[in-house]
Amino acid sequence: MIISKCIDEKHIYTAWRENGERQFKLEAFEPYFFIEDDEFQFENYTVNKYISRPFKYEKGEWLSLKGKPLKKVIVEQATDIYKARKMWNKTYEADVPFGFRYAIDKLEELPEFKLRKWYWDMEWQQGGEHHDKITVIVAYDNYDKEYYQWAWFPNYDGDKELFFDNEKDMIESFIQCMIDKDPDMLIAWFGLKFDLPKLLDRCCALGINPMRMSPINRIEGVKKAGNGHTFSKAESGFSPIQQPLGGRITLNLDLAFERQWNDSQRGTLPSMSLEYVSQTLFGEGKSKETKFEDPNEFYRRGWLEDTEAYLKYALVDVELLVRIDETNFCSEAIVALQRLLVAPFEACFYASHMGSIYFMRNADWICKTGSKVDKREEYEGAMIYDPLSENTNGLHLNVAAFDFAGLYPSMMISRNISWETKSEEPTEFGCDIATPRDFSEATRTHMLYYKTDKLGLLPRAVLELKDLRNEYKRLMRDAREAGDDLEVVKWHNNQMAVKRLMASFYGIVAFQGFGWADVNLAASITASAREAIRLAAFKAKEMEV
């Protein structure tokens, strides 16, 4: 589902499909954060030296983690929060992105539908008279299952559809096709870094209105200027998860594939180039049929001097994108995670985003606003031991492997480790955070305790998600037995989405400076894991083999 903030920072646009047709909703939504109930209520806040706006306040039953009553502070625009929150020393959830806030408050589930996807790529001239001009654009539409190739050539007088004699007409045709086809998702390889910024930059240079590509007339970095537009991100590009094109999802397929590859524990890829990934997956890469032996010469001269090879090169790049995604289900895996989180698409990549969305939905308290950490607080991490000091080096026969299933999540459950379950009194759920990181004898203790009377948010979330993942795995097995390949893929993606979400939980408590971060929780989790590994190792040493 598409969840985009509008240019006025007051409305949210959501879009989905019913029977293949796009449906949308435009909804006003007030941006807000929280302060403690006894804090002073300022009447206005300053946006800049010319503009000030009134605050609105709302009383409710909101509480902080420590049980302090809170009240809501409402501002006019989402971008106002950054300055408005500085009027108080302590705020709560003042760092939640506007789209995240809307999804948490307004959405309970996301509709399941087939997204219309465009896989696309561009080539632009390197050197010469037409340096930096876009020469070819290729797109594949997964609804009509067609490849489209736009190109232009100086003095072109042919009649081939989508071929032009100038760059401007070619780009205008591409944009009009985007408007007509109305794709939900644009998928490219490093497209947010290179292709989309280049397209927007050339639009502005040629006097083309790039805003037409956005159903809600919002593109980050693009501003109206006189009779045209300017673009401020031509050099830097966008971040890999950014959603700059309001009303459409943009996906860097390289990022989605890399995450999936790493999840499968197949090792680190030495290169994320499309050529290397394609060779690794399929044993074949980009088209290299050209009269130029030097690739740089091909990029510089191929457009006009080896046109057929140049056009094929551009087409094959998009064919590879389609093949990578349709054989590995990279984009659908992220869509499955989005439906699980009930969140904007950009929330589905980093642990801090995934975890915070989930916890804000399920906590019965309001989290403090994150703050910059000048110096990280150190704590002991995972086990590290030296085979020489442990006398385990050498040849071993009759070796058995032992592994914990979900070690860190299991420790959260076993010790009831959570923000609200900390105990100042000793309990059965004690964690010795001084547990050694090797198999040496413990020489000191430093105990942290957790309550036993009520299951905490963190272990409760793990247990609920484990049950959900097991259910998805069961449905996947049923689909496999029924020979329904599409359902197998669907439930595999869903169970992997749950796995990724659970894996984010440790990362979020260890991410210092973030609102949900807590060093004591992180230290308790890693210490409990070390204790479990040490106990297993000591038991193994007692065995006679």
Segments predicted by a language model, with ranges:
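DnaQ-like (DEDDh/DEDDy) 3′-5′ exonuclease domain used for proofreading
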Residues: 1-182, 204, 316, 320-339, ...
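Conserved catalytic core of nucleic-acid polymerases
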Residues: 97-99, 404-407, 413, 417-418, ...
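Beta-sheet entry/capping signal
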Residues: 115-117, 136, 184-187, 192-193, ...
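Residues immediately flanking
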Residues: 120-124, 253, 402-404
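Active-site-proximal helix-loop-helix substrate-binding element of RNase H-like nuclease domains
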Residues: 147-149, 157-165, 182, 186, ...
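Structured alpha-helical segments in the cores of large, soluble enzyme domains
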Residues: 166-178, 274, 278-291, 494-506, ...
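Proline-aspartate-enriched helix->loop->beta-strand connector
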Residues: 174-199
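Common nucleic-acid-contacting/processivity interface regions adjacent to the catalytic cores
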Residues: 295-416, 484-531, 539
